[in-house]
């Protein structure tokens, strides 16, 4: 217990501390966005990383060579590595730039002059200030790109000026790295020009300078102005023009001997880029789906033109035609780029002889062609799903059997996984970009294809993450195996080069191969492999080597490159640096489509992948947007759907016995989601979302609330809880609510406050000690018994009995006032006085043995002639109801006393077997212990007092009213016993009619018993001291004689008919006699029950 308390306190402290940190983080306006952008990849809890440290310079392990050719290769390799690092960082910054408008959240126009508009605009400017650090980093990044591009051109010019045979292959690799940087500069330029920041920049500068004038020195203002001018170059100006201006300085440094080789290589590179752009002529939307090729080609052509490098006229014409065909290229969902406008702005001389311009902002595609693309995407998605399933099975099989005997298969599986991930990523981005370029909204099927592709990416990522230990063990061996192959091929190639006749070329080739061997001997990091690619690129296209060796070297290099970066590529397909388009487009995914797609997932594995990828992308968006995503995640949607669906399933199963048997039950296609309950937990922002726990909590709360609202239907919810446990394997917590059976129901306090309603709407059974509701709107009748009262007494304490008796006393006062008013009425009092004179005159005569039946019947008929109420009841019926309500109130007192005894009897289990005295006497005990002993003895004494029969509430109720009702002034009450015969006759008629109604339908207010009348009658007779006078009437004897006379009269009629015509008995007469006899028997039965109840009731008041 002590350890549990410590853990509970520690947990509450951590929760409170976490809440304070989250609150503080939400309140801080200046949240560093770029810091979060650098830590995007969410690694698992335990991750094994076998990648080498790429930050180590690869040339540290190289030996300095005497040949000059080694230094250009090393320099170009380092510059290409820097280009790759800058590109990876640029992708992260581009995604953060895309969400910069969301962070501003400027919903009010700048010209609003109201206080709310000023406050909203100032808030946007404050958030803009918090992003200045991020814009500074982007500015530094772009400046670094300009420096790298200058160094690249300078190094290329220096390399080609050396009189050596440098092949085009490694120059093309340098041009590829350069084009990639140019692409990122164009993207940053368009993002800045088409964002809200550029429109608000002038206002922001004015606001910032006004804010700083009163609080800053001149030196600080000068520094601020300089910084703002630098950032303004990024946001409002053409940064690509700044790049071209910086490159113009290099034009003066180019010598005549370097211009011609650069021109030759540049034209060859442009020619190759044109072939890549037009590689798939069947898909005319290829460059819209993946616009990087046309962006790189256009930017490279502009840079070459700006440097004054001569391009072939045919190449220029082809480039202009290509640009004219692509008016607007989508960079992402909200930013477009115009290649023709870009060329017109930066290379006007090339556009002078431009081809015919095409109207329209985008390609015109017929709906049938678009439908063809949609069907092709769905078919490709299905094929990728099948291939990934087979790939994952084969990968697991290789791990189970052992990799060392299947290194070739293992290598092929890794490369296939890498290829599948690239295909999935490209297909998803291409589908989105195609719709953006065509300006057509994505349909539900398109979003479902994108969601399924995201699941495929998560499947590949999980396959590699779940087998990290095996990859660490086997990939090292695999790399060693491939390295030995590469080294063997290098030795073979070296032997081939020895036969060359040109000494200088032979020395250069041998030195390059030697450097490649030294590079490949270490761990094949990206820096090392970049150098190897550039080094081997010098003779890959050389015709002196055999074609088979060239092909094999290309294949081996490609595999080594893929394996060296396999963990980053596969694990990073959902990372922002690899697929920023997917992350940004996931923000626009419609919640209704995501909800519909999640409802289609009936496999826990696919559901888990969808929830995991949704969490991953939402988490990345929250980092870049600076706040949580307001949309519902896939986990919330699936939990909401499963909760509603499984609740409906449990309701149907619980009520299945009410359904009729179906003729064809197998035609109903009911979806089974039970397997989704066992989906594995998914981590999100430090919390693990477990679908099973959410469902158990939902059903626990639902069953509790429904049982509280409708306690009469507690069995249905208990059955649903049982089905949830047995069928769904869920364990909802028991609600521990009292079930509404005989010993549970309406609370005693509620009855006490509504005693007038209770006495009129419940019927009392003296033998069973229960009250039963006479009329109810529901299907069930409420029953209140001894155990129910005992439970209420245990809940509220025994003191509630005295309070309830006081309420009943007040209720009886009202009823006795009505009782006295009725007997004081002149119509009633005069007739009772007449009956009193008759009874007084004849009670001593021998012929007068009992009160005549005829006089009671006549008295009842005269009362009936006085009139009826609105619902057809006579005054005698209303008076009988008053007596019954008085009896119900007295019977409820008896039920309370019995329930109190039952509760005290239950409490005896806490009492010791021996009547020991716990008083300490002279012993010294703690004060708290002594106080507990006193409270225990006090409670025990109170229980004994309540359990004993010393308190007789019937006598208290008699003594409370007798002084007033037996007052000589209330002489009209002395004749009450004379109305009892008529009152009993009215009661018997009422009970007989009630029991006849039981066999009829649609009858309300029917009761099998009503012992409250007998108790009320005996209670009033005892209170008025008229019990002896009532017995002197001998009414039971009168009723017996009357019923015997009626029965003999029926027999005489039947005997007379038999004597007159014994052979011709009337059938109708027989039926009439049978009905009359049955009626007499019913009256006799009711009279016997009444007199038995009256005799039992007299015992209570003795």
From Swiss-Prot:
Component of the WASH complex. Keywords: Endosome, Protein transport, Transport. This is WASH complex subunit 4. Belongs to the SWIP family. The gene is SWIP. It comes from Drosophila melanogaster. Signal peptide: none annotated. Acts at least in part as component of the WASH complex which may regulate wash nucleation-promoting factor (NPF) activity and is required for its membrane targeting during endosomal sorting. During embryogenesis, not involved in the wash-dependent developmental migration of hemocytes anteriorly from the tail. GO terms for biological process: endosomal transport; endosome organization; nuclear envelope budding; positive regulation of cell adhesion; protein transport. The lineage of its organism: Eukaryota, Metazoa, Ecdysozoa, Arthropoda, Hexapoda. Disulfide bonds: none annotated. It is found in: Early endosome. GO terms for cellular component: early endosome; endosome; nucleoplasm; WASH complex. It holds the Pfam family WASH-4_N.
């Amino acid at each position: 217990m002590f350890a549990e308390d410590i853990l509970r306190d520690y947990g509450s402290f951590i929760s409170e501390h976490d809440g304070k940190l989250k609150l503080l983080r939400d309140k801080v306006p200046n949240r560093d966005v770029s810091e979060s952008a650098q830590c995007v990849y969410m690694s698992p809890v335990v991750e094994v990383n076998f990648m080498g440290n790429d930050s180590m310079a690869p040339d540290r392990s190289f030996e300095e060579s005497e040949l000059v050719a080694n230094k250009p290769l090393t320099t170009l390799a380092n510059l290409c590595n820097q280009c790759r690092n800058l590109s990876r960082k640029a992708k992260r910054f581009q995604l953060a730039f895309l969400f910069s408008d969301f962070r501003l959240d400027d919903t009010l126009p700048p010209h609003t002059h109201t206080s709310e508009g000023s406050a909203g605009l100032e808030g946007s400017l404050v958030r803009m200030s918090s992003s200045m650090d991020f814009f500074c980093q982007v500015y530094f990044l772009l400046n670094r790109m300009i420096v790298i591009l200058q160094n690249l051109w300078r190094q290329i010019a220096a390399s080609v000026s050396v009189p050596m045979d440098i092949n085009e292959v490694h120059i093309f690799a340098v041009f590829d790295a350069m084009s990639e940087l140019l692409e990122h500069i164009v993207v940053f330029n368009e993002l800045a020009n088409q964002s809200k920041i550029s429109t608000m920049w002038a206002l922001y500068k004015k606001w910032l300078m006004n804010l700083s004038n009163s609080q800053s020195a001149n030196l600080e203002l000068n520094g601020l102005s300089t910084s703002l001018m630098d950032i303004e170059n990024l946001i409002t100006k053409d940064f690509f023009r700044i790049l071209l201006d910086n490159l113009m300085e290099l034009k003066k440094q180019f010598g005549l001997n370097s211009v011609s080789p650069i021109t030759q290589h540049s034209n060859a590179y442009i020619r190759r880029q044109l072939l890549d752009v037009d590689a798939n002529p069947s898909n005319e939307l290829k460059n819209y789906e993946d616009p990087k090729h046309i962006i790189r080609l256009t930017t490279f052509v502009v840079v070459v033109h700006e440097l004054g490098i001569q391009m072939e006229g045919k190449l220029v014409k082809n480039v202009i035609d290509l640009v004219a065909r692509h008016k607007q290229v989508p960079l992402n969902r909200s930013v477009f780029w115009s290649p023709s406008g870009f060329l017109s702005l930066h290379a006007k001389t090339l556009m002078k002889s431009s081809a015919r311009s095409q109207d329209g902002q985008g390609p015109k595609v017929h709906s049938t062609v678009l439908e063809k693309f949609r069907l092709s995407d769905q078919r490709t998605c299905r094929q990728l799903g099948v291939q990934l399933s087979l790939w994952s099975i084969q990968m697991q099989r290789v791990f189970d059997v052992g990799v060392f005997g299947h290194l070739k298969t293992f290598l092929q599986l890794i490369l296939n996984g890498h290829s599948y991930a690239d295909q999935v990523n490209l297909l998803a981005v291409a589908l989105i970009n195609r719709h953006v370029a065509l300006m057509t909204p994505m349909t539900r099927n398109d979003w479902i294809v994108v969601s399924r592709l995201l699941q495929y990416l998560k499947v590949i990522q999980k396959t590699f993450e779940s087998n990290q230990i095996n990859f660490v063990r086997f990939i090292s061996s695999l790399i060693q195996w491939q390295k030995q192959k590469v080294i063997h091929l290098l030795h073979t190639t070296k032997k081939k080069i020895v036969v060359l006749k040109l000494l200088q070329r032979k020395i250069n080739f041998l030195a390059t191969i030697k450097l490649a061997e030294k590079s490949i001997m270490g761990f094949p990091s990206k820096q090392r492999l970049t150098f190897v690619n550039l080094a081997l690129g010098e003779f890959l296209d050389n015709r002196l080597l055999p074609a088979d060796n060239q092909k094999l070297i290309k294949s081996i290099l490609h595999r080594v490159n893929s394996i060296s970066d396999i963990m980053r590529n596969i694990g990073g397909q959902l990372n922002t640096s690899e697929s920023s388009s997917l992350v940004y487009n996931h923000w626009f995914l419609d919640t209704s489509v995501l909800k519909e797609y999640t409802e289609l997932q009936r496999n826990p594995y696919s559901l888990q992948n969808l929830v995991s990828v949704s969490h991953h992308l939402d988490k990345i968006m929250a980092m870049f947007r600076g706040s949580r995503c307001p949309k519902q995640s896939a986990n919330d949607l699936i939990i909401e759907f499963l909760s509603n669906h499984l609740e409906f399933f449990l309701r149907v199963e619980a009520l299945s016995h009410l359904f009729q048997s179906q003729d064809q039950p197998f035609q109903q296609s009911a979806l089974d989601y039970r397997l989704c309950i066992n989906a594995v937990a998914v981590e999100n922002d430090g919390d693990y979302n477990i679908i099973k726990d959410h469902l158990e909590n939902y059903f626990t709360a639902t069953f509790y609330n429904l049982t509280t609202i409708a306690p009469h239907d507690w069995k249905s919810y208990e059955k649903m809880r049982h089905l949830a446990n047995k069928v769904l394997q869920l364990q909802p917590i028991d609600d521990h609510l009292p079930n509404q059976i005989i010993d549970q129901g309406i609370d005693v306090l509620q009855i006490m406050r509504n005693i007038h309603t209770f006495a009129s709407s419940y019927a009392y059974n003296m033998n069973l000690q229960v009250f039963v509701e006479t009329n109810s709107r529901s299907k069930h009748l409420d029953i209140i018994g001894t155990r129910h009262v005992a439970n209420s007494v245990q809940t509220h304490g025994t003191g509630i009995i005295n309070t309830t008796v006081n309420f009943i006393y007040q209720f009886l006062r009202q009823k006795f006032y009505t009782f006295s008013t009725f007997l004081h009425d002149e119509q009633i009092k005069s007739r009772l006085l007449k009956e009193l004179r008759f009874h007084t005159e004849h009670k001593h005569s021998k012929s007068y043995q009992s009160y005549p039946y005829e006089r009671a019947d006549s008295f009842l008929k005269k009362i009936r002639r006085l009139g009826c109420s609105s619902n057809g009841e006579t005054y005698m019926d209303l008076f009988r109801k008053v007596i019954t309500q008085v009896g119900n109130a007295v019977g409820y007192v008896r039920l309370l006393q019995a329930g109190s005894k039952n509760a005290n009897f239950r409490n005896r289990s806490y009492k010791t077997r021996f009547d020991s005295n716990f008083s300490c006497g002279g012993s010294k005990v703690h004060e708290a212990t002594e106080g507990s002993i006193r409270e225990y003895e006090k409670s025990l004494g109170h229980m004994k007092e309540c359990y004993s029969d010393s308190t007789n509430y019937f006598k208290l109720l008699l003594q409370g009213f007798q002084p007033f009702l037996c007052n000589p002034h209330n002489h009209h009450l002395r004749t009450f016993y004379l109305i009892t015969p008529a009152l009993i006759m009215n009661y018997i008629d009422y009970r007989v009619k009630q029991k006849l109604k039981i066999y009829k339908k649609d009858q309300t207010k029917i009761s099998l018993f009503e012992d409250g009348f007998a108790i009320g009658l005996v209670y009033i007779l005892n209170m008025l001291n008229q019990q002896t006078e009532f017995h002197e009437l001998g009414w039971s004897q009168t009723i017996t004689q009357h019923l015997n006379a009626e029965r003999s009269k029926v027999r005489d009629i039947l005997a007379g008919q038999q004597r007159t015509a014994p052979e011709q008995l009337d059938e109708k007469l027989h039926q009439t006699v049978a009905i009359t006899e049955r009626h007499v028997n019913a009256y006799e039965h009711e009279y016997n029950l009444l007199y038995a109840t009256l005799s039992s009731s007299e015992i209570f008041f003795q």
